[in-house]
A protein has these predicted regions:
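Class I SAM-dependent transferase core
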Residues: 1-76, 80, 110-127
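Residue-level signal for inorganic ion chemistry
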Residues: 36, 174, 215
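Conserved hydrophobic residues forming the short capping helix/wall of the S-adenosyl-L-methionine
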Residues: 40, 119, 164, 185-189
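Conserved SAM/SAH cofactor-binding pocket of Class I
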Residues: 52, 63-147, 157
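Conserved beta-strand segments of alpha/beta enzyme cores
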Residues: 101, 126-128, 169, 192-197
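A short glycine-rich, Lys/Arg-flanked "PGG" loop and its adjoining helix->strand segment in the class I
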Residues: 157-169
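Conserved beta-strand signature within the Rossmann-like core of class I S-adenosyl-L-methionine
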Residues: 167-179
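Active-site capping/gating segments
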Residues: 177-218
């Protein structure tokens, strides 16, 4: 276990990639990584293969996407993270934007306890956790939400169609295959939602292009 912790620490490069982030933010990200490493075996929070590369695969991806999201709409004051699981990108958003209320929605009670523990350990007073299914959420209760590794765009729109209010926006973090998902959206869904690319981006290392998309409910 000590060797794994040392390996994780050795591959931590966020300070080099994001030098503009404050020392407090960097410290919270490092502590969050330690919590993920500690509890992953029991809770299956992320793929074990990604543990040595958490900084690039999970943290950098979430940081870049969340920054793009708030650049797209700086007036967001409450953001839901649907299917939060390990807390990406919701915990990242909470650390970067402490004045924004972040609600993590997760159906697995054990993962909810982990998320609550993370919020406490990182002193994130802007975070709340909902142990529920998205389908069970109150009608038209959500104005802004984000998903990562949740479902394809079409399925995400179907699952969230009741809880997202009119003019509400659902953001989708996607890999380079995002165009295929957009092309597969049924015509009927496009009468309810309007899809759009917000921005493509690349991680600090590698050439793969990722994307943040949004679907606005009509």
């Amino acid at each position: 276990m000590a060797e794994k912790a040392e390996a994780a620490s050795a591959s931590w490069r966020l300070e080099n990639w994001f030098p503009n982030l404050s020392s407090d933010v960097q410290s919270k990200f490092k502590k969050y990584n330690a919590l993920l490493q500690k509890h992953n075996r029991a809770l299956n929070l992320v793929s074990s293969k990604t543990l040595p590369l958490m900084d690039i695969i999970h943290f950098s991806d979430s940081i870049l996407a969340i920054q793009i999201l708030f650049d797209d709409n700086p007036k967001i004051d409450h953001l839901y993270d649907f299917g939060s699981g390990s807390g990406f990108p919701g915990i990242i958003a909470a650390v970067l934007y402490p004045k924004v209320k972040i609600t993590l929605v997760e159906m697995d009670p054990k993962k909810c306890e982990f998320l609550k523990g993370c919020a406490d350990e990182l002193n994130l007073t802007n975070v709340s956790v909902m142990n529920t299914t998205i389908e069970s959420m109150q009608l038209d209760s959500v104005k802004f939400a984000v998903t990562r590794g949740f479902a394809n765009i079409s399925k995400s729109m179907l699952i969230t169609r009741k809880c997202v209010a009119s003019k509400g926006v659902l953001y989708h973090m996607k890999n380079e295959q995002w165009g295929l998902e957009v092309g597969q959206i049924p015509t009927q869904l496009c009468s309810v939602w309007t899809p759009a690319l917000v921005k493509e981006y690349k991680l600090p290392i590698g050439e793969v292009r990722f994307a943040l998309l949004k679907t606005e409910k009509n």
